[in-house]
């Protein structure tokens, strides 16, 4: 099943809902960063959460999620946009802890239960919008939920799941976000809360072949779900050799001379996707000459 996200309105517009299948997206991140199980689940959940938040944006608007906990996985940085594209990395990809008391991947142990959870939105205006909350769980889903309630002041239920196989491959990944709008009936909220308590984990549902639409039907009742949009999602990085060349020019003439004289070349690695870009000595000389021209123009 190809990865996609659905947006829905429910209960006469009093509930907004989103659900996503992201197995291929998280698999691509796992492959690119060679992550081990705990790191895969932590990075994967953050990618899925960022895609869900990104679905509330317009096409070119984008956001960054930073999870900076006190666990061995280190910081997780993920970008997403309104077109269903995401990219991200985890500082320590090689964390594989024992299963927790419930027999699940120990994401909290990898992330830590103290630290800062940050979302930065770039809506194409002069300034970005930033919100920050403490990490309350380290399980990622609960941290997204807390952020939405406190910083965005939108009561939400967010479920994120990543199922990792014994060979480190991703068996299933996905998530949902249910948002309560002003004026929602208490009986509706009670019904949804009961459903949330009864439904198996999202990753299990997706592994069993359920679609994002079916997940929402389970959570909200099929008769109440009006699907508005279906959008493909993917891991996609916008890095390029040209962009890194611009960054190399910016490091300065002395640094470029050192790369030319001592290393006779350079390699740039994108943190987000691990793509590598090689620059020959001749290319570096061209970049240095451009840096010199830029200096003279100033």
From Swiss-Prot:
Processing and modification events after translation: Under oxidizing conditions two disulfide bonds are formed involving the reactive cysteines. Under reducing conditions zinc is bound to the reactive cysteines and the protein is inactive.
Gene3D superfamilies: Hsp33 domain, HSP33 redox switch-like
Gene Ontology CC terms, in alphabetical order: cytoplasm
Pfam families tied to this protein: HSP33
Example GO BP: protein refolding
Localization per record: Cytoplasm
Record's protein name: 33 kDa chaperonin
Molecular functions (GO terms): protein folding chaperone; unfolded protein binding
SUPFAM superfamilies membership: Hsp33 domain (SSF64397), HSP33 redox switch-like (SSF118352)
Keyword Chaperone: yes
Function summary: Redox regulated molecular chaperone. Protects both thermally unfolding and oxidatively damaged proteins from irreversible aggregation. Plays an important role in the bacterial defense system toward oxidative stress.
Gene transcribed to yield this protein: hslO
Entry similarity comment: Belongs to the HSP33 family.
Originating species: Enterococcus faecalis (strain ATCC 700802 / V583)
């Amino acid at each position: 099943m190809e990865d996609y996200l659905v947006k829905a309105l429910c209960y006469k517009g009093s509930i907004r809902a989103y659900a996503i299948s992201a197995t291929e997206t998280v698999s691509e991140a796992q492959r690119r960063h060679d992550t081990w199980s705990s790191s895969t689940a932590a990075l994967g959940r953050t990618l899925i959460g960022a895609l869900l938040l990104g679905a509330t944006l317009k096409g070119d608007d984008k956001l960054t999620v930073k999870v900076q906990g006190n666990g061995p996985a280190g910081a997780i940085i993920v970008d997403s946009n309104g077109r269903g594209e995401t990219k991200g990395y985890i500082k320590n990809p090689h964390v594989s802890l024992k299963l927790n008391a419930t027999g699940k991947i120990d994401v909290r142990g990898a992330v830590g239960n103290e630290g800062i959870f940050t979302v930065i939105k770039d809506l194409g205006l002069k300034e970005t919008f930033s919100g920050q909350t403490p990490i309350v769980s380290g399980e990622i889903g609960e941290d997204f939920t807390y952020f939405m309630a406190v910083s965005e002041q939108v009561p939400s239920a967010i479920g994120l799941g990543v199922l990792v196989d014994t060979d480190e491959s991703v068996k299933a990944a996905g998530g949902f976000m249910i948002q309560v709008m002003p004026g929602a009936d208490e009986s509706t909220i009670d019904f949804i809360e009961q459903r949330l308590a009864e439904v198996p984990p999202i990753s299990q549902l997706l592994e069993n072949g359920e679609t994002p639409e079916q997940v929402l039907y389970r959570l909200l009742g099929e008769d109440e779900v009006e699907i508005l949009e279906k959008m493909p999602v993917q891991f996609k990085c916008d890095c390029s050799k040209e962009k890194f060349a611009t960054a190399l020019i910016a490091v300065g003439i002395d640094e470029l001379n050192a790369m030319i004289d001592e290393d006779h070349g350079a390699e740039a690695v994108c943190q987000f996707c691990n793509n590598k870009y090689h620059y020959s000595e001749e290319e570096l000389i061209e970049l240095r000459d451009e840096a010199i021209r830029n200096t003279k123009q100033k």
